[in-house]
């Protein structure tokens, strides 16, 4: 995630949620907005679990994003963890995330 910045304002989140594409995968929802900027946000609500579980979920999603980062187009990405993310293995989540990114046409 060296090349990607974090979201800084609420308006950035709103624009991606409203204008961007959305795809539901097992364990995660992916939002993508094609842009010249490279930004990422990882979100886990309290529905996912307590703070320890939410932080672990976000760490896993960041690690998976770092794995795919060099193959992705520039744009704004938001990954929202679902409550079932805690039950999935890393490899299964990786497969689902790759499939979702492919469906959103995020790969170069």
From Swiss-Prot:
Keyword hit for Transit peptide: no
A GO CC term assigned to this protein in UniProt: ribonuclease P complex
GO term, biological process aspect, one: tRNA 5'-leader removal
PROSITE patterns: RIBONUCLEASE_P
Coiled-coil segments on the chain, per record: none
The keyword RNA-binding appears for this protein: yes
EC number of the protein: 3.1.26.5
Keywords carried by this UniProt record: Endonuclease, Hydrolase, Nuclease, RNA-binding, tRNA processing
Superkingdom, natural source: Bacteria
Disulphides: none
Alphabetical list of Gene3D superfamilies matching this protein: 3.30.230.10
Catalysed conversion reaction: Endonucleolytic cleavage of RNA, removing 5'-extranucleotides from tRNA precursor
Family stated for the protein in its record: Belongs to the RnpA family.
PANTHER family, A to Z: RIBONUCLEASE P PROTEIN COMPONENT
Described function: RNaseP catalyzes the removal of the 5'-leader sequence from pre-tRNA to produce the mature 5'-terminus. It can also cleave other RNA substrates such as 4.5S RNA. The protein component plays an auxiliary but essential role in vivo by binding to the 5'-leader sequence and broadening the substrate specificity of the ribozyme.
UniProt-listed HAMAP family: RNase_P
Record note on quaternary structure: Consists of a catalytic RNA component (M1 or rnpB) and a protein subunit.
Name the UniProt record assigns to this protein: Ribonuclease P protein component
Lineage, top ranks: Bacteria, Pseudomonadati, Campylobacterota, Epsilonproteobacteria, Campylobacterales
